[in-house]
Curated annotation (Swiss-Prot):
This is GMP synthase [glutamine-hydrolyzing]. It comes from the Bacteria. It comes from Shewanella piezotolerans (strain WP3 / JCM 13877). Homodimer. Its EC number is 6.3.5.2. GO terms for cellular component: cytosol. Pfam families: GATase, GMP_synt_C, NAD_synthase. NCBIfam families: guaA_Cterm (TIGR00884), guaA_Nterm (TIGR00888), PRK00074.1 (NF000848).
Length: 525
């Protein structure tokens, strides 16, 4: 079995919104990489022993006092280094070049760079050819400051009309800098540039692929767990489902899954989970029907943050009770993924505001004396999905839209009641069914229905009735950090509205949410 961690790239994060995208692109190429904060020590870098280092972008100005710098060891480690945007600027400044502050002449968005000098980074890459016969590349820029003087030993590789050093290289030391962002899809040849860096310049093998990751994970799980038993909270979501399948492959029936039906799931979801994992895949599952317990705990509570905390607390209580029945279990499995690990490391800086409490944070009881098994903690979400497919999980389940941990608890606005959840489940199922029928489901990033605790007058036949209102929500987004409302066709929205009002007794009005993020969040609570 090849060692999937033998060849690796270290990415240093200076705060760019694109940094995780760089890591995902390197992984897609087939090379393992990790994302660390910029202020790491020489000892940590030596311990990781990367084959190459990428200095990512960031929002700061290299010209400002106390702005971040790469550790000096980066340039003495004897491995190739690629600086992207801010990473190029700090590389230039730290190695003796100069950076000037942009005054009204930054480049933001599409640009075309002209390649002046051959470079291993741009080998056999071009989008067009200039009048003078030089390669042109379509790229994505996002910078105010720029390099005004490159360090000794470097050559200018590419430029634009306003940026004299759009790319630079010291081929002897294998140091490269690009002012644009090769990791975003708008840079058409960006993936090939990153391939040149990771595979050709750094000499990495492309061993990081789903089948190898599964093989490696199964071996590591067997070694970690031995003959012990493991319990897992199975929600039916992507992460816990893939953890269940990996553990089942590694340790078979030594895995016990606890599936807690909190009454806040989608239509028929509990039955689907039991059918797939219990009947089809043959996993040991304890099914806990806890609808009343969750609803009773939330009775009278309208505050979204409090509802989230109650849902989390009741889940922990139930899971704790069930785990004590599994007396032989020595390990607790969790679906922690790599962005959770990055977020936890990053949150230590204390710079981010709390927008919403994350339903996985807050944890299980301190007195739960179980070891932790986290087989997905190195993986991004797209990698988890690919592994799920390889393990035999259905595509529709792995690629369905995100569903919040508290479920309908945060899609029923205000107090949560069984009547509201039942109506919402039916309305949401119609919306999703119609999206699939119209071939629109995969064209939006997330779609769902929200229950509004207001009654609205409706006309049915000759009579009037006061019934509930639901809102349809559909958004388009790349990263869920920002989102546009989806411009669904009017006739489609009309069809969904008619079906909901005519087929569900208790709903008299359907509205469509046309708020973007920001200022609104994607979920209503």
């Amino acid at each position: 079995m090849s060692n999937i961690h033998e060849h690796k790239i270290l990415i240093l994060d200076f705060g760019s919104q694109y940094t995780q995208l760089i890591a995902r692109r390197i992984r897609e190429i087939g090379v393992y990489c990790e994302l660390w904060a910029w202020d790491v020590s020489e000892e940590q870098i030596r311990g990781f022993a990367p084959n190459g280092i990428i200095l990512a972008g960031g929002p700061e100005s290299v010209t400002a006092d106390n702005s971040p710098r790469a550790p000096e060891y980066v340039f003495n480690a004897g491995v190739p280094v690629l600086g992207i945007c801010y990473g190029m600027q700090t590389m230039s400044e730290q190695l003796g070049g100069k950076v000037i502050q942009g005054v009204g002449e930054g480049e933001f968005g599409y640009a075309q760079v002209e390649v002046q000098t051959e470079s291993a980074l741009f080998k056999a890459i071009e989008d067009a050819v200039s009048e003078t016969g030089k390669p042109l590349l379509d790229v994505w820029m996002s910078h105010g400051d720029k390099v005004s003087e490159i360090p000794d030993g470097f050559v200018t590789v590419a430029n634009t009309e306003t940026c004299p050093f759009a790319a630079m290289a010291n081929e002897d030391k294998k140091f490269y800098g690009v002012q644009f962002h090769p990791e975003v899809t708008h840079t058409r040849q960006g993936k090939r540039m990153l391939e040149h860096f990771a595979l050709d310049i750094c000499g990495c093998d492309a061993n990081w692929k789903p089948s190898s990751i599964i093989e490696d994970a199964v071996e590591r799980l067997k070694k970690q767990i031995g003959d012990d038993e493991v319990i897992l909270g199975l929600s039916g979501g992507v992460d816990s489902s893939v953890v269940a399948m990996l553990l089942h492959r590694a340790i078979g029936d030594k895995l016990t899954c606890v599936f807690v039906d909190n009454g806040l799931l989608r239509l028929n979801e509990a039955q689907q989970v039991m059918d797939m994992f219990g009947d089809h895949f043959g996993l040991n599952i304890i099914h806990v029907d806890a609808e009343n317990r969750f609803l009773d705990a939330m009775a009278g509570e309208a505050d979204p943050e409090s509802k989230r905390k109650i849902i989390g607390h009741v889940f922990v209580e139930i899971f704790d009770e069930e785990s004590k029945k599994c007396a032989n279990a020595k390990w607790l499995a969790q679906g922690t993924i790599y962005p959770d690990v990055i977020e936890s490391a990053g949150s230590a800086t204390g710079k981010a505001h709390v927008i919403k409490s994350h339903h996985n944070v807050g944890g299980l009881p301190d007195d739960m004396e179980l070891g932790l098994v986290e087989p997905l903690r190195e993986l991004f979400k797209d990698e988890v999905r690919k592994i799920g497919l390889e393990l035999g999980l259905p595509y529709d389940m792995l690629y369905r839209h995100p569903f919040p941990g508290p479920g309908l608890g945060v899609r029923v606005l205000g107090e949560v009641k069984k009547e509201y959840c039942d109506l919402l489940r039916l309305a949401d199922a119609i919306f999703i069914e119609e999206l699939h029928k119209a071939d629109l489901y995969n064209k939006v990033s997330q779609a769902f229905t929200v229950f509004l605790p207001v009654r609205s007058v409706g006309v049915m036949g000759d009579g009037r009735k006061y019934d509930w209102v639901v809102s349809l929500r559909a958004v388009e987004t790349i990263d869920f950090m920002t989102a546009h409302w989806a411009h669904l066709p009017y006739d489609f929205l009309g069809r969904v509205s008619n079906r909901i009002i005519n087929e569900i007794d208790g709903i008299s009005r359907v509205v469509y949410d046309i708020s973007g993020k920001p200022p609104a969040t994607i979920e209503w609570e």
